[in-house]
Curated annotation (Swiss-Prot):
NCBIfam families xref list: mnmG_gidA
GO biological process, one term: tRNA methylation
GO molecular function: flavin adenine dinucleotide binding
Described purpose of this protein according to its UniProt entry: NAD-binding protein involved in the addition of a carboxymethylaminomethyl (cmnm) group at the wobble position (U34) of certain tRNAs, forming tRNA-cmnm(5)s(2)U34.
Protein name, per record: tRNA uridine 5-carboxymethylaminomethyl modification enzyme MnmG
GO cellular component, one term: cytosol
Subcellular location: Cytoplasm
A Pfam match: GIDA_C_1st
Binding residues for FAD: 19-24
Residues that hold NAD(+) according to the record: 278-292
Gene: mnmG
Assembly information from the UniProt record: Homodimer. Heterotetramer of two MnmE and two MnmG subunits.
Similarity section: Belongs to the MnmG family.
């Protein structure tokens, strides 16, 4: 139990954040930094910001969201840079839309830096306790009651409970209550949410056994080195600080699969003990072996847990098989024949709320002042959770200050795609973000997250003066470079022809701009230095973004045209209390779907499964009638 707020805590908080995982930490920091009195309630103050599963942040689409969090003024990118021990750019040989940053994280270092910043943050108080129920007064959330018998009052309550709601851990046919291994679950809150009117379901996720590093033979594995130099997540931080380590790659084999099949009769998944739906895109190793019997091997990434940690994380073999089966399976994998298990792999079942019960702000429709973010909304992943935590916090702040809500469009942020998918379509399985979910992904590159979102973060009060100055300087440099590339012209004289010859390129027959030259597929911005030495004075991130804008200008223009075409529907707001039952031309099925989702805009209505173009026309006609009245 710790209190750090001075003077003494208020009788009324602006917001209580329940849960100190990635959603909760991001939300609590944002609210406090924007000046709101915030209480962070956690069952274990020693594990604030703990990486419960794999020690990594980022990846495809996930790295994009970390950059977006940073661009808005959030914390995950800064924390990951400070604790990262291997940075790699994924899809580096592919187009800029799908390139993504992924970092191995020192688990202990990450926890230390998160706790340091949480406990040092003004306006933020930490209290170790378990939330038992939501206080409801005058039709809205008014606070939280805890297991210690405390009542904390607040204008808003944000639940970021992760896997803790009625959490149950499974190892083989043994199971016991737990929010994660070593932590108690939240047992009372689910009943309170049901009493409020929320429908809860059951999901499942899992993790791998942890292995003793000194018992692993890395010489039998392929080395996966870090990038040199490492590329940090944060636009505004000091960069990567810790020494960088390699990861290693090995594979399962038929002997591994035989050991796994031998344990199917004791698998809680295959025997029906686990009822919750698991993650489609992060299946257990037993699920992979059962579903893909034709595959002779599955990849295993052996990842360090930290610079000084004695443990490694064998990414790719999450399992809930009995411990003796886990041991037999591990012993068949090259390099792991003598590996000792420090902690077993396990599955965890937990309650979640189908997110169609939320407004686009992540406030519940059932109760004003109650907000949900993270795995409670059916998502998987640290990054998805942190993005929702920040999204909810910004909207709580907007509500407190009577400002318009923070609702960027699907063409502006991956986190907007995430939230829109959740509240429009709901989910019956753990939702994971992919670049393929974004229809405008060329506009949503990692390297332009600041250009897309930092002005918004500044307007909302989360981007501080230092961050704003760094962004403004970079933006000015980018505009300067783009102007030079478009306006600086090259005439095909003898000197220019000689440069083109050395580049292996045909010389132009008439004067061209540097931008025209850069659009040639085989040339990059550094190749232009012989024509203009000034290109070398710009920072790498500025040059990279300028090159992307120039080379992909035609594609970017077409994407912007598509966005402009859909803007009318996205800007047409539907009243929250609209009575769909009285609108002529709507089928009963469509009325039910619209009534359940209650879309914020006509564009969101169009994304609801089964809502036809004819139904959208009916909605537009109804809106015109309402306007005439």
């Amino acid at each position: 139990m710790s209190t750090i707020r001075k003077p003494s805590p208020p009788d009324m908080y602006d917001c209580i954040v329940v849960g100190a995982g990635h959603a909760g930490c991001e939300a609590a920091m944002a609210l406090a930094r924007m000046g709101h009195a915030t209480l962070l309630l956690t069952g274990n103050a020693d594990r604030i910001g703990h990486l419960s599963c794999n020690p990594a942040i980022g990846g495809l689409a996930k790295g994009h969201m970390v950059k977006e969090i940073d661009a808005l003024g959030g914390m995950m990118g800064l924390w990951a840079d400070e604790a990262g021990i291997q940075f790699r750019t994924l899809n580096s040989s592919k187009g800029p839309a799908v390139r993504a940053t992924r970092a191995q994280i020192d688990r202990d270092a990450y926890l230390r830096v998160v706790r340091r910043d949480i406990f040092a943050q003004p306006n933020l108080r930490v209290w170790q306790d378990m939330a038992e129920s939501i206080i409801v007064e005058e039709g809205r959330a008014a606070g939280v009651r805890t297991a210690y018998g405390q009542e904390f009052r607040a204008h808003h309550v944000l639940l970021t409970t992760g896997t803790f709601l009625q959490g149950r851990i499974h190892v083989g046919l043994s199971n016991f209550p737990g929010g994660r291994l070593g932590d108690a679950p939240a047992t009372g809150l689910s009943a309170s949410l049901r009493a409020i009117g929320l429908e809860l379901g059951r999901l499942k996720t899992g993790t791998t056994p942890r292995l003793l590093r000194d018992s692993i033979d890395f010489s039998m594995m392929e080395v996966q080195p870090p990038d040199d130099p490492p590329r940090p997540f944060s636009f505004r931080g000091p960069g990567v600080r810790l020494p960088q380590l390699p990861c290693h790659v090995t594979w399962t084999n038929e002997r591994t699969h035989e050991a796994i099949r031998a344990g199917f009769d004791r698998s809680p998944m295959f025997t029906g003990v686990i009822k919750g739906t698991g993650a489609r895109y992060c299946p257990s190793i037993e699920d992979k072996v059962a579903r893909f019997p034709e595959k002779e091997r599955h990849q295993v990434f052996v990842e360090p847990e930290g610079l000084e940690s004695p443990e490694c994380y064998p990414n790719g073999i999450p399992t809930s098989l009995p411990l003796e089966v886990q041991k037999a399976m591990i012993a068949t994998i090259p390099g792991l024949e003598n590996a000792q298990i420090v902690r077993p792999g396990y599955a965890i079942e937990y309650d979640y709320a189908d997110p169609v019960q939320l407004r686009s702000t992540l406030e519940t429709k059932a109760l004003r002042g109650l907000w949900l973010a993270g795995q409670i909304n059916g998502t998987s992943g640290y990054e998805e959770a942190a993005a929702q935590g920040l999204w909810a916090a910004l909207n709580v702040s907007c509500t407190l200050r009577s400002m318009p809500p923070f609702l960027p469009g699907r063409d502006t942020a991956y986190m907007a795609v995430l939230v829109d998918d959740l509240v429009t379509k709901g989910t019956r399985e753990p939702y994971r973000m992919f670049t393929s979910r974004a229809e405008h992904r060329l506009l949503l590159r990692e390297n332009n997250a600041d250009a897309r979102l930092t002005e918004t973060g500044r307007a909302l009060g989360l981007v501080d003066d230092t961050h704003w100055q760094l962004f403004s300087t970079k933006r000015a440099a980018l505009h300067s470079l783009l102007d030079e590339l478009e306006n600086r012209r090259i005439t095909p004289d003898a000197a220019a022809r000689d440069i083109f010859s050395r580049l292996g390129e045909p010389a132009p027959t008439k004067g061209v701009s540097l931008a025209d030259i850069l659009r040639r597929p085989s040339l990059t911005l550094p190749d232009l230095a012989p024509f203009w030495e000034g290109v070398t004075r710009f920072a790498d991130d500025v040059r990279e973004e300028a090159e992307t804008i120039v080379k992909y200008s035609g594609y970017l223009a077409r994407q912007q045209e598509l966005v402009a075409r859909s803007a009318r529907m996205e800007d047409t707001v539907l009243p929250e209390d609209m009575d769909y039952t009285v609108i002529p031309g709507l089928t009963r099925e469509i009325v039910e779907k619209l009534g359940k989702v209650r879309p914020h805009t006509l564009g969101q209505a169009a994304r609801i499964s089964g809502v036809t173009p004819a139904a959208l026309t009916c909605l537009e006609i109804q809106l015109r009638k309402m306007g005439q009245r």
